[in-house]
């Protein structure tokens, strides 16, 4: 962080950064998860209504648009959308965006470095938990990082047809991943808890990473269910062959966050060309074009 950046940080902002390091991340996340799963009837519906109002959640596109349709806060948070709310681009040479949100960063992986925020990079090897094979596959490739805010739809979809080959759960920190902290906490995305999913696709190997954050109670995939909790502190790896290797179609749901976070996509060198319109803060919607086959 240079001296100019330091001068621009207010005292209140410094406290926000310090709080991220000092707070009991796991305990807060466990407490939030417990409350979010409680069935409290009218109280739950009131909390959902206040949350939707505060964050301007667009309920008209939800499959269940009434607050009273949700028995728990988590049911609301991972709400499904109406059937045609997110049309999937059908161009067979194009990949589609996996999540609603905003582009945090995107572009070329410079050797083994990805851009986290302006002036701040982090290591591909660290992001992939030191996995040598994956690091080699995606070195000098392309990446897209999508931030999901509290108001966004929190189910994650497939950019293209793919077959799961490997999944790695990486324990880690639970820093908030909002844009301010993403700029001021070094290596944040490579330090946070995450689930790394490697797929075989018609575009070559693709990684889709679901990154946890403060009060992200759980991350789930459609083929394994809830990955965390438990949080044992150990890296866990799944490999898939034969009938255990689930295939998913372009646009199909592949996972979800119970309280939100970030999705990172990785592509090998010379595999895809990212869509020209993608840049920092571009609003994303599931099904819109992410990249084209080279």
Curated annotation (Swiss-Prot):
Kindly identify the residues recorded as the active site: 100 (charge relay system), 157 (charge relay system), 261 (charge relay system), 261 (schiff-base intermediate with substrate)
* UniProt modified residues of type Pyruvic acid (Ser): 261
Q: In which pathway does it act?
A: Phospholipid metabolism; phosphatidylethanolamine biosynthesis; phosphatidylethanolamine from CDP-diacylglycerol: step 2/2
Catalytic function, reaction form? a 1,2-diacyl-sn-glycero-3-phospho-L-serine + H(+) = a 1,2-diacyl-sn-glycero-3-phosphoethanolamine + CO2
Which keywords, in A-to-Z order, does the entry hold? Cell membrane, Decarboxylase, Lipid biosynthesis, Lipid metabolism, Lyase, Membrane, Phospholipid biosynthesis, Phospholipid metabolism, Pyruvate, Zymogen
Please state the Enzyme Commission number of this protein.
4.1.1.65
Q: Which GO terms of the cellular component aspect does the record hold? A: plasma membrane
Q: How does it sit in the membrane?
A: Peripheral membrane protein
From which domain of life does this come? Bacteria
Site (described: Cleavage (non-hydrolytic)):
260-261
A Pfam match is PS_Dcarbxylase
Tell me what PTMs the record reports for this protein: Is synthesized initially as an inactive proenzyme. Formation of the active enzyme involves a self-maturation process in which the active site pyruvoyl group is generated from an internal serine residue via an autocatalytic post-translational modification. Two non-identical subunits are generated from the proenzyme in this reaction, and the pyruvate is formed at the N-terminus of the alpha chain, which is derived from the carboxyl end of the proenzyme.
Q: Name one GO biological process term.
A: phosphatidylethanolamine biosynthetic process
- GO molecular function per UniProt: phosphatidylserine decarboxylase activity
Tell me how the cofactor is bound: Binds 1 pyruvoyl group covalently per subunit.
From the Swiss-Prot or TrEMBL record, state where the protein is found. Cell membrane
Q: Which cofactor does it need?
A: pyruvate
Which Cys-Cys disulphide bridges does the record give? Answer: none
Q: Which HAMAP family match?
A: PS_decarb_PSD_B_type1
| Cross-referenced PANTHER family | PHOSPHATIDYLSERINE DECARBOXYLASE, PHOSPHATIDYLSERINE DECARBOXYLASE PROENZYME, MITOCHONDRIAL
Q: Which family does it belong to?
A: Belongs to the phosphatidylserine decarboxylase family. PSD-B subfamily. Prokaryotic type I sub-subfamily.
Its name, as the record gives it, is Phosphatidylserine decarboxylase proenzyme
The organism encoding this protein is: Mannheimia succiniciproducens (strain KCTC 0769BP / MBEL55E)
């Amino acid at each position: 962080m240079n001296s100019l950046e330091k001068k621009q940080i207010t005292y209140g902002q410094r406290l926000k950064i310090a709080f991220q390091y000092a707070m009991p991340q796991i305990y807060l996340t466990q407490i939030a998860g417990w409350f979010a799963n409680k069935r409290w009837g009218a109280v739950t519906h009131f909390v959902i209504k206040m949350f939707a109002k505060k964050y301007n959640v667009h309920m008209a596109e939800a499959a269940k648009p009434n607050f009273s349709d949700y028995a728990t806060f988590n049911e609301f948070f991972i709400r499904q959308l109406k059937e045609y709310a997110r049309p999937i681009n059908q161009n067979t040479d194009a990949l589609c965006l996996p999540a609603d949100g905003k582009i945090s960063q995107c572009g070329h992986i410079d050797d083994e470095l990805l851009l986290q925020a302006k002036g701040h990079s982090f290591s591909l090897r660290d992001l992939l938990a030191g996995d040598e094979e994956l690091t080699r596959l995606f070195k000098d490739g392309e990446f897209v990082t999508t931030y999901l805010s509290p108001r966004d739809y929190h189910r994650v979809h497939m950019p293209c047809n793919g077959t799961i080959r490997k999944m790695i759960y990486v324990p880690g920190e639970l820093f908030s991943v909002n844009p301010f902290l993403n700029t001021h906490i070094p290596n944040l995305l490579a330090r946070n808890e995450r689930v790394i999913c490697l797929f075989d696709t018609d575009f070559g190997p693709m990684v889709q990473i679901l990154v946890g954050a403060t009060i992200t109670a759980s991350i789930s995939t459609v083929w394994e269910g809830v990955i965390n909790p438990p949080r044992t502190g150990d890296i866990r790896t799944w490999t898939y062959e034969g009938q255990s290797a689930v295939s998913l179609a372009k646009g199909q749901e592949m996972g979800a966050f119970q309280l939100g976070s970030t999705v990172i996509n990785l592509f090998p060198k010379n595999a895809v060309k990212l869509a020209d319109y993608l840049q920092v803060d571009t609003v994303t919607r599931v099904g819109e074009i992410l990249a084209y086959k080279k």
